[in-house]
């Protein structure tokens, strides 16, 4: 209808678009509102630094200013100018790239810098400055040249890190590895409210608003093991469902009776917070409740990573979700995990790829794992076996 856009009330949509539209122009139009030398009561880099989406000539650098991280960041409602440096050595005696970037209140004072003109397949060190404060020194690595054949590519993948279920003890082990890249396959956070008698407790109830989602990411990123792994390696990230809501499928909520307006308004909050906290390029900037996260990442002629999004475009889970026999809607030719556009993009990339290995960085199990007992064979309808026609198309490639 004329009163809605993306299923969201027009007034809310216009307010959102006015906010995000102002961001690229901020450096031009808001010079008088930019704070160049802020003073902080505490360390503004409590959430550390990160890098991601490596290319042969560059990488994304990330930080977020939050002197009081659990008090919604503790930043004033104004833009702050940060300075960044990239060097070939940890002492920064050979700085090869530097510049400034605005930390905008509209994006929770997060900073995303796309650095280019770097050498391929090389380690670099980076840091941010704001006022008289300096961030921890991050380490990152560019990808090999597209026509190069490196001897090896070493990467680790992580996923499904539930804060309440335990400490992130895998990360200190990962930090000891000689890695080129960390790939996160989704469920970076969990959206559930805090539970008693768990190892750790989420702050607040189930998250819904933008401040809620920001707080949850903040709580996770304050974990020292996670923060340190971000500091040490570039990351390639994608989401699954819990960055928004359990088992959602495109525009369909797991719960019955959720209006499209509420669903999309919440998805908009979730997607914006995800972008704010991840080292992503501007090409992934969210547009309302939509965000293009699927993308490629090539490591020379050795490996070609295809990063997938199996949530935003899929059809509803068949047979009422959960674990069910492979019958009925499982074989619906219209059933899709990726959506037409993403599947076409993926197949085109695979056809064009000349790399030895094509790696699908994606969220859910491809193999049909029987979760039943005896002759009662049951499979997760939320995973690829629930989308059997789509699965077979991909495996036939």
Predicted regions and their residues:
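Metal-dependent phosphoester/phosphodiester hydrolase catalytic core
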Residues: 1-25, 32-397
């Amino acid at each position: 209808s004329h009163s809605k856009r993306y299923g969201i009330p027009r007034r809310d949509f216009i307010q959102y678009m006015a906010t995000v539209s102002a961001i690229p122009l901020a450096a031009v139009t808001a010079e008088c509102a930019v704070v160049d030398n802020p003073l902080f009561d505490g360390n503004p880099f409590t959430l550390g630094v990160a890098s991601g989406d490596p290319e042969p000539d560059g990488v994304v650098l990330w930080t977020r200013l939050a002197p009081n991280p659990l008090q919604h960041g503790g930043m004033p409602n104004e833009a702050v100018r940060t300075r960044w440096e990239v060097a070939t050595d940890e002492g920064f005696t050979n700085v090869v790239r530097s510049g400034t970037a605005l930390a905008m209140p509209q994006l929770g004072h997060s900073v995303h810098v796309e650095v280019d003109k770097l050498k391929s397949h090389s380690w670099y060190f980076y840091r941010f400055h704001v006022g008289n404060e300096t961030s921890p020194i991050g380490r990152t690595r560019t990808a090999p040249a597209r026509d190069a054949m490196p001897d090896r590519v070493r990467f680790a993948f992580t996923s499904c890190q539930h804060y309440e279920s335990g400490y992130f003890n895998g990360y200190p082990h990962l930090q000891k590895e000689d890695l080129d890249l960390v790939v996160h396959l989704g469920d970076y956070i969990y959206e559930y409210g805090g539970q008693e008698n768990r190892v750790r407790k989420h702050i607040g109830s189930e998250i819904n608003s933008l401040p809620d989602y920001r707080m949850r990411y903040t709580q996770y990123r304050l974990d020292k093991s996670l923060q340190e792994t971000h500091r040490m390696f570039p990351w390639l990230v994608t989401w699954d469902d819990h960055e928004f809501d359990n088992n959602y499928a495109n525009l369909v909520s797991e719960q019955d009776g959720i209006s499209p307006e509420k669903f999309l308004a919440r998805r908009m909050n979730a997607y914006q917070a995800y972008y704010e906290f991840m080292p992503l390029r501007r090409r992934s900037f969210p547009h309302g409740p939509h965000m293009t996260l699927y993308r490629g990442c090539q490591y020379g002629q050795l490996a070609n990573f295809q990063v997938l999004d199996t949530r935003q475009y899929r059809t509803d889970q068949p047979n009422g979700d959960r674990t069910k026999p492979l019958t009925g809607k499982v074989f619906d030719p219209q059933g899709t995990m990726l959506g037409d556009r993403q599947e076409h993009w993926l197949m085109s990339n695979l056809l064009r790829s000349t790399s030895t290995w094509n790696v699908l960085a994606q969220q859910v199990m491809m193999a049909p794992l029987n979760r039943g007992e005896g002759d009662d064979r049951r499979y997760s309808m939320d995973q690829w076996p629930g989308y059997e026609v789509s699965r077979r198309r991909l495996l036939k490639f």
